[in-house]
Amino acid sequence: MNIESKIKELTDQLNQFAYEYYTLDEPSVEDSEYDHLYHELVKLEQENPQLVRADSPTHRTGGVILDGFVKFRHPYNLYSLGDVFSREELALWEERVRKEIVNPEYICELKIDGLSLSLYYENGLLVTAATRGDGTTGENITENVKRIKDVPLKLKEAIDIVVRGEAYLPRQNFAKLNAERELEGAAPFANPRNAAAGTLRQLDTKIVAKRGLATFLYQEASPATNDTQEEVLEYFEELGFQVNPERKFARNLDEIWEFIEEATRLRDELPYDIDGVVIKVNNLAEQEELGFTVKAPRWAIAYKFPAEQAETEILSVDWTVGRTGVVTPTANMTAVLLAQTTVARATLHNVDYIQEKDIRNHDKVMIYKAGDIIPKVGKVLLEKRKPARHLRKTHRANKYVWTRFGRRSVEKGLVFSKREDNRVKIPTQCPECDSDLIHFEDEVALRCVNPLCPAQIREKLIHFASRDAMNIVGLGPSVISQLFDKKLVTDVADLYQLTVEDLLTLDKVKETLAQKIVSAIAQSRENSAEKLLFGLGIRHVGGKAAKLLLERFANLRALSQASEEEISEIPSLGGVIATAVVSYFETAGAKTLLDELENAGLNFAYLGAVNVEGILSGKTVVLTGKLTTLKRTEAKEKLEALGANVSGSVSKKTDLVVAGEEAGSKLTKAQDLGIEIWSEQDLLDL
């Protein structure tokens, strides 16, 4: 046997052994035999580096120091899930599904508490792994994901596919990692999720390989070739992916709830952390029929487990002003450990929330983390509230008190008493600019409407530079606050006039950081226009809405001149967003700001736009069967270039099916529905 054949044999053998060990949990060889074969392969590859295969198991052992992580733009939108916290909320979601789908069936899966990622395979080989990021743009973490031993570098079939899943750190590995960190004098990780996220952002791949991350894959992001979610998961197992076996088929709310109760009981016994249950409509065609909101699919929901709670005391309440002028109360509390992190502050939302719960200073309260993330005050422990005291105070000479008759002097030694009042003082003036606060009838928030309020301007600048908006690395809240205080910037357009010399006048900003910030500002000019639109901070316009708006109007200038009626025609966007967008661009200064940003060289075009004037413009097309000339990704790109929306399943909304060889149930269903059928050659002839 020649060397190339031997390397091929060893690579295939070791990959099969790894599949049996990590995926099937049925090892067929002893560790010693695996190690012997592995070291034999390492030696042969070192002597013959030109023969190393892309799926070699030696890629998993680390040894690469990365310079950083580059951005990766996902070809498919990676939506987050809506969530519910009770059976009643779940019932409302299920009721909405039943209004659209007759006798829906569901798949219930455990919600893994880890880091979401996407894996891209071409011809069966792993070519890219990326974090979800904001659902549109993530980070390329391919080298690190290759060090996760249960991620197949080569699939059982030579196909193109994009899959979504969760990377997590098993509890046993988490305990081992923290024990090692304590011995080294390093701070322990707060929880396995933080450890998993931190591990995947390591620049040294040896550290990733050592920590023992694992994965569960659960969704095909590229157009699916199966008819149900259940079939997708079974297909993933056949391809070599790790799929969570803890799942249940359900036909109604009662059966869904049975699985949730079972998952709740199992939660502490599992070798990994979960934070809920994901419920999905099983039929993929029905998923497509239900569609999406701006942020999430209508065909799936996440039930979140009741949050862990802790008792603490409210010490005081701060009021802060956000970028839209909303004044938000935050409780300062006695620090307490909650969900494995120390919490000393919690949001109180708004005045109504404080008054409804009768929250007072020095109250004992129960706090929890909504979705295990944001600390919130849940319940006031009224039985532990101390009765109000009478305070006695002696005023010295030359002091004054206010009475309804005006100010009067207090003689030395005069004593008076008053009743202690621990109720939270509701502000009537903005804590930043002293303008009168307004409480609009249709809102629960207190709002500062002064457009020159320094807090609002500062927060708008911070939002503009943030990761989900223009992503200007290095330009964080501290730097922006200093720039604003020194009057070096007064609006977002001023950021594009900054120089290294300007930045060097700030505290803790040295030459290297200043150069990095100026470079990041310059790079942000090339961002797609939906990032800029989101960065402008228009009320009700989040990242998803910004993308939908720019997909429709293609250019920020065109959007700025659109009417409410035109915007309201966009699916998933309502009148509230339309009114907010039109109102923003009608305000004094909006046109001037756009002119300044355009003159500064910012991109106003939506970079994801396709030619929508093609012969398939607005048509929904499904690919099915085996293509002999085109790769599936090439066929999809060709269809999209012709204006088509490529879907993964056949429904009444499908306009056309392109059927290759061995097309199965999708072709049959299309024929039953009378949908137009094309061959691969028909597509090639265009």
UniProtKB/Swiss-Prot annotation:
BRCT domain residues: 611-686
Keyword DNA damage (UniProt): yes
GO MF terms, alphabetically ordered: DNA ligase (NAD+) activity; metal ion binding
GO CC aspect terms: cytosol
InterPro entries: BRCT_dom, BRCT_dom_sf, DisA/LigA_HHH, DNA_ligase, DNA_ligase_AS, DNAligase_adenylation, DNAligase_N, NA-bd_OB-fold
Entries under SMART domains matching the protein: BRCT (SM00292), LIGANc (SM00532)
Keywords from the named record: DNA damage, DNA repair, DNA replication, Ligase, Magnesium, Manganese, Metal-binding, NAD, Zinc
Active-site residues (renumbered): K111 (n6-amp-lysine intermediate)
Annotated binding of NAD(+), by residue: D31, S32, E33, Y34, D35, S80, L81, E109, R132, E166, K280, K304
Names of required cofactors: Mg(2+); Mn(2+)
EC number of this enzyme: 6.5.1.2
Record carries keyword NAD: yes
Protein family (similarity comment): Belongs to the NAD-dependent DNA ligase family. LigA subfamily.
Described function: DNA ligase that catalyzes the formation of phosphodiester linkages between 5'-phosphoryl and 3'-hydroxyl groups in double-stranded DNA using NAD as a coenzyme and as the energy source for the reaction. It is essential for DNA replication and repair of damaged DNA.
Record's protein name: DNA ligase
Lineage: Bacteria, Bacillati, Bacillota, Bacilli, Lactobacillales
